[in-house]
Amino acid sequence: NKRIVSFFFLLLFAGSLYAAIGIIDLRTEQLKNPAGIDVRQPRLSWRIESDEQNVIQTAYHILVASSPELLEQGKGDIWDSGKIESDASQWITYQGKTLKCNAPYYWKAKIDTNKGATNWSALAFWTTGLFNEADWQGQWIGLDRAAPGDSETQWSRLAARYLRKEFAVKKSVKRATVHIAGMGLYELFINGQRIGNQVLAPAPTDYRKTILYNTYDVTSLLQTENAIGVTLGNGRFYTMRQNYKPYKIPTFGYPKLRLNLIVEYADGSKETIATNTSWKLTTEGPIRSNNEYDGEEYDARKELGAWTQTGYDDKDWMQAQRVSIPSGTLRAQMMPGMKVTETLKPVSIKKLGNKYILDIGQNMAGWVRFRIK
């Protein structure tokens, strides 16, 4: 009896030890479930979680599948690493089948340690972006000149560009993905809903070398009739004090847009809604000027109404133009975007003539939100 009790105690002890070790925080290129990466052999990482001390990994096993269902069945149809004797848990290079552009991949891992093996981790995933120039159907569009009301003197002014396109979806949608490069900054809307939670996108670069694009899954937003809307700001692409003396600040051209919306249907067919000269454009919106140095001028009398939704009357808008191609290489943004992290109230508000000065109490970058009665 004592032997039986001891045997069961050992089993329970081994079971508790087994459950006490796991792997968490699965990352691809050090990003958590990234969308639209343009790396053909991404690097995978995880962290060991354990109640025990001195746990050392001795081997790993990675599965990558084309669907969550296959991964749940333990089938790595894209890559099955097998058991690899290694203590590496960071920057493990993918060694499976050639990855396709604009495709989702699902993965999980398990490890052996000096104190037991783990169960399979929770599912993680990444999606690929567009690897080559040939993968982009979208043209660079915009308005490659100043509009009425713009000024390109020492104190430059350039109104935001507003672009829109309506399209229909007639079949059942399996997946819909947007790849967008909006220089210098953009906000993207589909059927009236703003896409993504990052701001001041994309991240700034040396535009002579690199232009970044972002990727979003918009499957749940598509209807039978749809509208895409994009606001283009200047960012650091069209530099607002480019003729500010005694220093010359580089500028890289007028705001411009390139976009692919790839719709994959349940019957296996695909369709791409891409930027071209069929898109409509106006500069007669409420954002009359915008730049990092001098802020934003917003004229609410020029608000455009429901321009990001279907059925909008854009007959007075111009056709978008094909514009000059940026010199930088188009690449996926492989870092987290900037986000709103805090909302602050002013510590004081002072009136100076017909202006109001808000003291936020600290140095910051952001926007003002207010109501007018």
Give the label of every model feature segment.
Residues 154-159, 320-360:
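Edge strands and adjacent loops of beta-rich recognition modules
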Residues 20-52, 127-132:
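Pro/Thr/Ser/Gly-rich low-complexity, intrinsically disordered linker/stalk tracts
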